[in-house]
């Protein structure tokens, strides 16, 4: 196989998708997320944390103190890709279910609460009136 064929085969190979968490082993705080590529997500988060560029400032702070040894990267639920189905919507639904418990916000975790639809619409409207 040449390089071009290998690249095409890689892109066409279905990736495992699902919900994951990054758990602080010291204080049990968690970051919960979902992804279409479970294989790559942990590498992405490790890279961001090692480069001190993770979007969660609290997680970054704790990572800087404890390092990789202080955290566990765990798959909470895996979802099989299905044709004729909005896989991203399924993932978002699953993530929302996992966010209900343990509600990893504030003292319990590193996630930021999702805004309600009304809050998002209000923000969009406010930006339009400012511009």
Q: Where in the sequence are the language-model features?
A:
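Structure-specific nucleic-acid interaction/processing domains
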Residues: 1-32, 36-127
